[in-house]
């Protein structure tokens, strides 16, 4: 159970103005209504749940779960078998492109219960599980991020209309599992339970590219207990999958290559549809292999690594940031740098946004009035995040990929106001502590 959160008595919480409240609720409420109503109109015009769900990424997850559940785990990456299972699951409809299982084999073991269900029922159950995960996450993030009831309402509307979250729910993707894993790490870190933190982060192994920078941050922090717990959890997952499904890694990578060849640009590696530094470079140069493109990618990677080192290595020349702020910025650096990031994967930025919103609000109460405008700028840019993702989903301007440019701007402002964010006491930037039951 969770104890009610009481703001620290030494912190003067900033009251959100009514104008900002009404503007936020109106704008993001409208965007939420547009997104949800548009999907509902489309969904209601489908003759069945199967005809709706076969268009989404969940079909890939289901094929893997179905293969293991029906005793074909050793043939998990046999594309011919995957085609047969896909056609059987979506009958009487036929999907024109092969959309096979393209995730590590241990992830399919988690979904075996869904593989025992018909495709339509599995999609509905998975959607319900994801909604529960989102509700649990927001229940921990929103109350402690808001100073007033109005701010809680505004943050709820903003989070509910976050396009990566909506895409993850509709597509039936893995993002909520990764989100819950990251939240478990954050909560466990606050409780002083490093082993729980490492085990929680194992949930994000379904998309390991999303947690590379957080793992590097834990290593730079010398949080060996969390890393040991993570390594043990990862070892159990890998060992179990090898024991039950055979030596799958070589077959897995071969199947990925075959899927890319068969699906061409609609396949697994589509940089112009991504939202990371790689997509930023591709939008500018329309290639990833030219000299300027490679040079810019190298500069962005080195800058991200330099930022990571600055966050986690102590220095006498700069004050230390609270752990939660460092972790939030590490998450954003990781999303910017990862080579594979579609818009639905940006759902894991939710904790980062809330933690930075908290910290900047606390910092506003601790700096002189004349020095508050950069922090207000930071909060304004944070508030624009969901709108940027909404525009990125609907609009693809030439030479510009909105989300990575937005992340660079947000990170730049946060690093610029390092000294102000460092004023916040570590206990004042964190979500409500949990009690073991």
Segments predicted by a language model, with ranges:
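Aromatic-enriched
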Residues: 357-437
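Primarily membrane-embedded glycan-assembly and transfer machineries that use lipid-linked glycans
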Residues: 2-196, 218-350, 426-427, 431-437
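Short basic/hydrophobic patches in alpha-helices and adjacent helix-turn junctions
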Residues: 67, 283, 334-339, 353-362, ...
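Hydrophobic/aromatic-rich transmembrane helices and adjacent perimembrane loops
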Residues: 342-358, 406-407
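Hydrophobic alpha-helical segments of integral membrane proteins
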Residues: 33, 202, 338, 356-357, ...
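Structural signature of hydrophobic alpha-helical transmembrane segments
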Residues: 173, 202-203
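Generic transmembrane alpha-helix signature in multi-pass membrane proteins
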Residues: 110-111, 199-201, 212-215
């Amino acid at each position: 159970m969770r104890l009610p959160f009481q703001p620290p008595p030494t912190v003067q919480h900033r009251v959100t103005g009514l104008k900002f409240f009404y503007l936020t609720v109106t704008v993001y409420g409208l965007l939420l209504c547009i997104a949800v109503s548009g999907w509902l109109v489309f969904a209601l015009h489908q003759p069945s749940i199967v005809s709706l769900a076969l268009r989404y990424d969940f079909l890939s997850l289901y094929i893997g779960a179905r293969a293991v559940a029906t005793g074909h785990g050793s043939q998990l990456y046999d594309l011919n078998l995957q085609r047969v299972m896909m056609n059987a699951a979506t009958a009487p409809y036929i999907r024109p492109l092969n959309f096979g299982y393209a995730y590590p084999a241990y992830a399919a073991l988690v979904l075996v219960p869904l593989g025992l269900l018909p495709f339509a029922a599995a999609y509905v159950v998975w959607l319900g599980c994801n909604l529960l995960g989102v509700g649990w996450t927001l229940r921990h993030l929103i109350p402690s991020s808001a100073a007033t009831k109005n701010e809680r309402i505004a943050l709820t509307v903003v989070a509910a209309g976050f396009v990566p979250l909506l895409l993850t729910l509709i597509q039936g993707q893995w993002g909520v599992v990764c989100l819950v894993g990251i939240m478990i790490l954050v909560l466990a870190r606050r409780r002083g339970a490093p082993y729980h933190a490492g085990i929680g982060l194992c949930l994000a192994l379904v998309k390991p590219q999303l947690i590379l920078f957080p793992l590097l941050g834990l290593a730079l922090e010398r949080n060996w207990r969390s890393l040991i717990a993570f390594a043990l959890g990862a070892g159990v997952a890998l060992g179990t999958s090898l024991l039950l499904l055979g030596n799958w890694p070589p077959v897995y990578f071969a199947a990925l290559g075959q899927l890319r060849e068969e699906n061409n640009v609609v396949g697994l590696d589509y940089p112009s549809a991504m939202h990371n530094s790689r997509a930023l470079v591709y939008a500018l140069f329309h290639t990833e292999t030219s000299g300027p493109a490679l040079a810019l990618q190298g500069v962005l990677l080195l800058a991200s690594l330099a930022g990571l080192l600055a966050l986690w290595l102590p220095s006498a020349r700069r004050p230390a940031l609270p752990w939660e702020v460092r972790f939030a910025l590490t998450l954003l650096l990781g999303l910017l740098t990862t080579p594979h990031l579609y818009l639905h994967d940006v759902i894991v930025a939710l904790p980062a946004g809330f933690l930075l919103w908290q910290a900047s609000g606390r910092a506003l109460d601790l700096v002189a009035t004349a020095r508050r405008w950069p922090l207000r700028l930071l909060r304004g840019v944070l508030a624009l995040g969901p709108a940027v993702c909404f525009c990125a989903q609907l609009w693809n301007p030439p030479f510009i990929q909105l989300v990575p440019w937005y992340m660079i701007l947000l990170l730049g402002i946060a690093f610029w106001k390092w000294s102000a964010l460092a004023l916040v006491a570590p206990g004042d930037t964190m979500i409500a502590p949990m009690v073991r039951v």
